[in-house]
């Protein structure tokens, strides 16, 4: 008996049955794979169905709750729907929004209330968004509508205080201004409005007249002290000159009268005729009269006519002893 055959059996025993088994296994694997895929899809569809059912229930609940309130405020609800549509249709133009209030701020609620959500209905032609909220939404929307109805101040106000154009005060215009001020009783009584009405000049505003009148008043007030001081100086000088003139005149008349008295007394004592004494006194008086006239002309600037003094003297006759 041989332990090891001389030629080993190298033929593979491959039967058709083995191939069939492999095919069956592969088919089973494919079926399991398909079932697995179908299982995932069925689970997803179940979840979708559940979520859609929940959504439908919530919609029915909210619609039932809102139906009671919409019956009383149907017009108000329609206006709110129009506002919502206009919000989504609005777009800013060059960075400036068309609406002044941020209307979307009124739709946010506190953390305790459930968050609102949107859903879309697509029918191939139209897609619309609607806001689904809790019953508190109607109260907030009502407040928003009431705030929008109130009148609000404009956002962009016009510039205030437009500056008036500059006005050139010519000599003729200033003369016209001074004439109007004088007609109104002087710069202290004149008012800018009355001066403007009296002048009646084109393109002349109240601001122009007011500033010019203020400058005119300051100039007039500064000129007053200088003129008053000049007048007082002139008056003082005239008084001094008059006093000097009076002193000179009194001195001259006193000197001439004393000389005449002395001469008359001497002639009377010697027994000379009075008429000759008067002639001599007149001859001596001539240089004094000339000096008086020259002094008075230098003081006054004119040469006035000198008046002859009163020469009527009462001379007592001497008592001649026999």
UniProtKB/Swiss-Prot annotation:
Function description: Probable transcription factor that regulates lateral organ polarity. Plays a role in lateral root formation and development.
Compositional bias ranges of the Basic and acidic residues kind: 17-35
Entry annotated with the keyword Amino-acid biosynthesis: no
Alphabetical keyword list: Developmental protein, Differentiation, DNA-binding, Nucleus, Transcription, Transcription regulation
Protein name: Probable transcription factor KAN3
DNA-binding region: 192-217
Species this chain originates from: Arabidopsis thaliana (Mouse-ear cress)
GO cellular component terms, semicolon-separated: nucleus
NCBIfam families registered for this protein in UniProt: myb_SHAQKYF (TIGR01557)
Chief location category: nucleus
Gene (name only): KAN3
Biological process terms in GO annotation: abaxial cell fate specification; regulation of DNA-templated transcription
Biased amino acid composition, Polar residues: 224-241, 299-322
Tissue expression summary: Expressed in developing phloem.
InterPro entries: Homeodomain-like_sf, KAN_fam, Myb_dom_plants, SANT/Myb
Region of interest: Disordered: 1-35, 222-244, 267-322
Location in the cell: Nucleus
Ranges for domain HTH myb-type: 161-221
A molecular function (GO) term: transcription cis-regulatory region binding
